[in-house]
Regions:
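Short extracytoplasmic
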Residues: 35-60
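Conserved, well-ordered alpha-helix/loop/beta-strand core segments that scaffold catalytic motifs
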Residues: 199-243
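Short, small/polar residue-rich loop motifs at catalytic or cofactor-binding pockets
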Residues: 34, 39-43, 239-242, 433
């Protein structure tokens, strides 16, 4: 009897311990077993063009998960068909067929920890495949919702947008504006019974998710496509290593197109073998610009009152300096009597250095900086831009001081060359080039708007005279072979730059380019095209057809009124 009483006493003490002393601890442990945490993903914001067309967006994708300890044969229906006993093997086969998943992978994930409450079966299902999986009615599978990144314009804008990787933003605008685009994840919990089914009304939100902002660009995706196709076709014809094209609105400084070849498709990054294509070369690839820079030197000369379009110079084929350095023009010619206009028209290295020497090295350096050279684009936030830390003085040796006047020994990007021509086209006023308007956050605030303060670089008179001189390049100079654009006066400058090969100096490779504006009497748009290491035509004449095609497309697309008068031409010789 005493033994029975003692045994009852033990049970009573244990019962009190469980129900009173340890009650809160055990309840919490039980709740934790039933309580399932779920991440609520904040949607990453879209990147859109100037018209709202999505360049990058987030779409809903679904992961299918399970609780391995609950995976077992079940009774009922499978996909609407009544089956007495649905085996695990039959269920997984049906799941693989509906989703496109791999049965072996599912089995492996379940077997990895068969007593656990969580394992992935399939990841990244679109809505159609997800609904097919749900229709199967398998009781021990669950959904996990997440956002996936898609790029509707694919390779057309891929070099600009960049892309996302498994560990976040990897390149381009995705990387530069990640802080605004990124959403903030939230969380919630729900309770489920022993059968793994969620208990109705048990969901509790512990942290609200917040969507990312929308990044609005100035890019016109239709024009971007035209530009990309134009340079891709030309680059293949020229057998060029790479190519870029830019289109700029003169009056706003907005870049309407920044195209590259080769391209990257952010929807399938692994297919891109050229890792240099992960960014936009128009912004990241520095090169010696060659003769396009002569337009800036001419503008500086006129602005300082050191020359006029009809100023006279005696121009031999070559010129040797006291320190032993020599320069020459691209093609042999007898000594010529050229005006400043003729020097630009014929792209004479010797001629531009003779007149350019009327400015000090510091003056020329200062003008180049005002035009937007020698520093990263201040209104563009983009990874990989060269630092170009030239300081406040040229620090050039004697030969570079001369060569810089025809674009050798200095570095630029294609967008910086576009900036020079935007300034000249805009009556001498530079507007920092940019292709982002700003990022609108989920609560409606606009952030990351670029600083586009205008700066006068040269007088309106100087800019107009240079524009008029550049028409001679098209009508009778290095672009004379380019088919005219009917009804429009075009002002442009060519560039054929040698490619430095380390300590070996300049070799046989070239970078060819054309930069120009239209209509010349009231420029609205600037177009640049650049080809790196072309093989079938190593002169700027090879770049001319692409420039003409793209400029024609721009003028037609934006319905620019034709020129009302003939081109104003200065004499090129005396």
């Amino acid at each position: 009897m005493l033994a029975v009483i003692a045994l009852v006493g033990v049970f009573v003490v244990r019962l009190v311990d469980i129900q009173v002393v340890q009650a809160s601890v055990l309840n919490e442990a039980s709740a934790q077993k039933r309580s399932i945490p779920v991440t609520i993903y904040g949607t990453r914001g879209a990147i859109v063009d100037r018209n709202g067309t999505e360049l990058a967006d987030s779409v809903t994708r679904y992961n299918i998960t399970t609780s391995p300890r609950l995976v077992k044969q079940f009774k009922g229906k499978l996909g609407g068909t009544r089956i007495k006993d649905v085996s695990v093997s039959t269920a997984l086969d049906a799941l693989a067929k509906a989703s496109g998943g791999d049965v072996a992978t599912m089995r492996k994930n379940i077997a990895a920890n068969p007593k656990s409450d969580f394992a992935y079966l399939i990841k990244g299902l679109d809505v159609r495949h997800y609904e097919a999986v749900v229709d199967l009615g398998i009781p021990w599978i669950y959904k996990e919702q997440q956002a996936s990144r898609v790029y509707p314009t694919a390779a057309t804008t891929g070099n600009l947008t960049g892309f996302m990787g498994t560990d976040g933003a990897q390149a381009g605008l995705e990387y530069a504006y990640d802080q605004c685009l990124a959403g903030t994840n939230g969380s919630e919990t729900y309770e489920r019974g022993e059968d793994g089914v969620q208990l109705p009304g048990s969901t509790v939100t512990t942290k609200k998710a917040k969507d990312g902002g929308t990044l609005e660009t100035t890019i016109d995706s239709d024009l971007q496509y035209m530009a990309q196709q134009t340079i891709a076709s030309a680059a293949k014809t020229l057998q060029a290593e790479s190519a870029t094209a830019t289109v700029t609105s003169v009056k706003t400084g907005e870049l309407l197109a920044v195209a590259d070849y080769p391209t990257v498709d952010p929807n399938d990054v692994d297919a891109t073998t050229d890792k240099g294509a992960f960014g936009s070369r128009a912004l990241t690839a520095s090169y010696e610009p060659g003769s396009t820079i002569k337009a800036a030197i001419a503008a500086a000369l006129i602005d300082q009152g050191k020359s006029t379009p009809t100023d006279q110079a005696v121009v031999p084929y070559s010129r040797t300096f006291p320190w032993g350095g020599t320069i020459h023009d691209s093609e042999f010619h007898p000594t010529e009597n050229l005006t400043l206009t003729g020097i630009l028209q014929n792209s004479s290295n010797v001629g531009i250095t003779e007149l350019g020497a009327r400015l000090t090295a510091q003056q020329r350096f200062d003008y180049m900086k005002k035009f937007g050279l020698f520093e990263p684009e201040t209104a563009i936030d983009y990874p990989g831009q060269p630092s170009m830390d030239y300081g406040t003085s040229p620090n050039w040796d004697q030969q570079t001081n001369i060569n810089s006047m025809f674009g050798q020994g200095i570095s630029t990007t294609a967008v910086q060359v576009a900036s020079v021509f935007q300034t000249i086209a805009n009556d001498g006023v530079r507007i920092p080039l940019h292709f982002v308007k700003g990022c609108t956050t989920a609560d409606g605030k606009t952030i990351d708007a670029p600083d586009v303060q205008k700066q006068r670089v040269v007088s309106a008179a100087a800019a107009t005279q240079v524009t008029d001189m550049l028409q001679s390049v098209v009508t009778g100079g290095t672009l004379v072979g380019m088919k005219p654009i009917s009804g429009y006066n075009i002002a442009a400058k060519t560039g054929t730059a040698e490619v430095a090969e380390g300590s070996q100096g300049y070799g046989g490779q070239r970078i060819t380019s054309v930069a120009g504006m239209a209509p010349a009497e009231d420029p609205q748009y600037v177009v640049t095209v650049t080809f790196t290491k072309p093989q079938t035509n190593k002169w700027s004449s090879g770049a001319a057809p692409a420039f003409r095609t793209l400029m024609s497309q721009v003028l037609e697309k934006y319905r620019v009124a034709p020129s009302a008068s003939e081109a104003k031409l200065y004499p090129s010789t005396w």
